[in-house]
């Protein structure tokens, strides 16, 4: 569980400390890469809460998602079609699905802990 959080903290820190500007022709690639990274991070948190987290799956999924997203955007540029929008849609849907599962999981655990406290008292 510490690997996703460490990556997020390091990424935010490096992004805030550097004055790096991205050219506009790379904005589609960057948006997909950020969404792919967030999807992988949220998926890792979901897997941890469900007890199925595996670092190898997390790291390989991270790189596979980024490579797939960038390849899709690259192909779309050469075909003259905005294929990056398909990646944005897919990662966005998965992101919200994972967040919904995390929310349900946390609410279930919270409700069970409240019931257990009432039964003890």
Swiss-Prot record:
It is a multi-pass membrane protein. Keywords: Cell membrane, Membrane, Transmembrane, Transmembrane helix. GO terms for cellular component: plasma membrane. It is found in: Cell membrane. Its main location: membrane. The chain crosses the membrane at residues 2-22, 29-49, 57-77. InterPro entries: DUF1290. Belongs to the sbp family. This is Small basic protein. It comes from Bacillus subtilis (strain 168).
């Amino acid at each position: 569980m510490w690997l996703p959080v460490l990556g997020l903290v390091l990424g935010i820190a490096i992004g805030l400390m550097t004055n790096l500007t991205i050219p506009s022709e790379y904005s589609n690639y960057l948006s997909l890469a950020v969404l792919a990274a967030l999807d992988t991070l949220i998926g890792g948190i979901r897997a941890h809460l469900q007890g199925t987290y595996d670092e190898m799956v997390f790291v390989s999924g991270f790189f596979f998602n980024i490579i797939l997203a960038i390849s899709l955007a690259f192909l779309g540029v050469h075909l003259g079609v905005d294929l990056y929008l398909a990646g944005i849609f897919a990662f966005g849907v998965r992101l919200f699905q994972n967040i919904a599962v995390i929310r349900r999981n946390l609410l279930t655990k919270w409700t069970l802990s409240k019931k257990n406290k009432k039964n003890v008292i």
